Regions:
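Rieske [2Fe-2S] iron-sulfur-binding domain
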Residues: 1-90
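C-terminal catalytic domain of Rieske-type non-heme iron oxygenases
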Residues: 79-269
Length: 269
C-alpha cells in the first residue's frame, strides 16, 4: 500500500492503473511508481538511482480484513509505530456465530461517527428498534480495559420492535460498548440467550468524510438465508444514524456539555 497523493501535482493515484511492469501509473501525467518510489517520468531517461516517491505502508490481513499502518513510511524509515495488536472479537473464533460485513460512506469526520456508535443515550430517540417509552439506560458501569481501550456496560428496556423483544423475548437487554484505539468500536447486545455483536472501523478519506466498515456477528438465525435480513437491518440503522449526524452543526460537533451517559465517548476522546 502506498500514499494516494502523486508528488508531481497531487493527483489521486488510486485513479491510475497497474502496468505490465507492475508499476502504478498516475492518471494525470503518467508518472510511474514501484512500491512508492518513482520508476519512470515521461520525457526523462529512466534511472535506477531514484530514491524519491510517496510513502509505502505496511499492510496486514487479520480476520479476513486488510489493515494498513499509515503512521510509518517503509521507504524513508520514518514515522511512528505503536506496540498494540489488532483487535479481533471473540465471536470471530466462535463457531456458534455467523458474520456479515459491509461499509458506508458518510459525510462526517470519523471520530464523530465512532462516538455516535458508542453513544448509549441516542438509541431510543434515533432508532426504530429503540424504546421511546423507556429511553434511559440503567445500571451503567465504565471500566478502562487498558490505556488504549475501555468498556461501558448498561441495561435498557427492549423496544417493542426490536429483535431482542421479538426473537429473544427479552424485556431487558444488556449492552456492552467497547472501544479500542485508534478506531475500533464494539457493541454487544445480549437478550436472554441471543447475542448480536457489531464491530466497526472508521477512517477518514477527506476533511469531512469517512468510510465506516462493520461486521455483525449473531448466534441466532445463523443460516446464510437470513443474511439479507441483517444487511437490511444494518442499512436501516445506518440510515437513521446518518440522518441525525447530518443535522449536527459542523462547528459544534463536540457539543458544549456532557452528562453521565456520555462517559464512553469522553473516554474515547
Amino acid at each position: 500500500a502506498i500514499s494516494d497523493i502523486c508528488i508531481h501535482r497531487g493527483s489521486s493515484l488510486s485513479g491510475g492503473k497497474i502496468l505490465k511492469n507492475n508499476c502504478l501509473q498516475c492518471p494525470y501525467h503518467g508518472w510511474e511508481y514501484e512500491k512508492g518510489l518513482v520508476k519512470h517520468i515521461p520525457g526523462y531517461v529512466d534511472s535506477t538511482n531514484r530514491n524519491y516517491g510517496v510513502p509505502q505502508f505496511e499492510i496486514k490481513e487479520v480476520n479476513d480484513d486488510i489493515f494498513i499502518r499509515p503512521t510509518f513510511d517503509i521507504n524513508s524509515k520514518k514515522g511512528n509505530t505503536y506496540n498494540h495488536t489488532i483487535y479481533v472479537p471473540p465471536e470471530a473464533k466462535d463457531p456458534n456465530f455467523s458474520r456479515i460485513s459491509g461499509k458506508r460512506h458518510i459525510i462526517r469526520p470519523n471520530n464523530i461517527i465512532s462516538e455516535n456508535v458508542l453513544d448509549m443515550m441516542h438509541i431510543s430517540y434515533v432508532h426504530s428498534f429503540g424504546n421511546s417509552l423507556s429511553p434511559v439506560p440503567f445500571n451503567m458501569k465504565y471500566d478502562d480495559i487498558n490505556e488504549l481501550s475501555g468498556k461501558s456496560t448498561f441495561h435498557y428496556t427492549a423496544g417493542p420492535n426490536s429483535m431482542s423483544k421479538i426473537i429473544g423475548g427479552a424485556n431487558y437487554v444488556t449492552v456492552e460498548n467497547e472501544f479500542y484505539l485508534p478506531d475500533v468500536t464494539v457493541t454487544r447486545v445480549t437478550a436472554n440467550n441471543i447475542v448480536k455483536t457489531i464491530v466497526t472501523h472508521c477512517y477518514p478519506i477527506g476533511q469531512n468524510e469517512s468510510i465506516l466498515h462493520f461486521d455483525l456477528y449473531r448466534n441466532f438465525l445463523q443460516s446464510p438465508v437470513c443474511d439479507p435480513l441483517f444487511h437490511y437491518q444494518m442499512k436501516l440503522t445506518l440510515d437513521e444514524d446518518t440522518q441525525i449526524l447530518y443535522r449536527i452543526y459542523d462547528d459544534y460537533m463536540l457539543g458544549f456539555m456532557s452528562t453521565k451517559f456520555d462517559i464512553t465517548q469522553i473516554k474515547y476522546r
